[in-house]
Amino acid sequence: MAPEISIVIPLHDEEDNVEPLVQELTGVMRSVGRPYEVILIDDGSADATFATLRRLQAADSHLRVIQFERNFGQTAAFAAGFAHAQGALIVTLDGDLQNDPADIPRLLDVVRTHDIVCGWRRHRQDAFLTRHVPSVAANWLLGLVSGIRLHDNGCSLKVFRAAVVKPLKLAPGMHRYLPALASQLGNRVAEVVVNHRPRRSGRSKYGLSRTIGVLRDIIGLRGLMRRAIDPATDASRLYTVKQILEAGAERCR
């Protein structure tokens, strides 16, 4: 049966988090009771993330694994997941267990009357000065530039209608601005408070340099939006796939 829901998860050096994440997702999606797939993108991990994914995928036909040639970044991983997603709805979340899969059913309920539903980490469980404060500033600036006021554009836990995101051509870093772009194109965007958990294992990939990059991107947002919907934009070099693991097949690229 073709999946109705595609769950897209970028992973970079998350060897200790990926198995418990898949276990949580499996329980949640069984309770949802709709056909689904989980697309896990190994974004050039240097640890045992891919080996763990290979083992998990061999035992679960819901899992599809995409391995990149090297680390291309989160936007590239999301873009690959969107390109391979078969469901009419696409759920995105981080692979570090800070997003709570138990929130997915509530977002799926809200998307019945919207095109994108964004998670809002009202009570963030990470560093106040280096993560929370820059996030507040970036969300304020993005609202000023784009006209859409969301509390938490950076939360990866979102649900999209596939018809909204599949046609878009993403530039590096652009995954954060999909709600703003979708709103500009006339789509309905909602925001739902979600749980945010402390990181259990591994280390955060975010730092000051990424915050500066986000602020720079927001200032140039209108240009990014034009590129995303321009038929002449070539997004084919955003990432290179090394291999794909899925039920009954292992393909090298």
Give, region by region, the residue ranges found by the protein language model.
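Acidic helix N-cap motif at the loop->helix transition within catalytic regions
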Residues: N17-E19, D47-L56
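N-proximal low-complexity "stem/linker" segments adjacent to membrane-targeting elements
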Residues: M1-G27, R34
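Conserved donor NDP-sugar-binding/catalytic core segment of glycosyltransferases
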Residues: P105-L129
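Glycine-rich, basic loop-to-helix element that forms the pyrophosphate-binding segment
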Residues: F68-A85, R106
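A conserved acidic beta->alpha catalytic loop
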Residues: D42-A51, L97-Q98
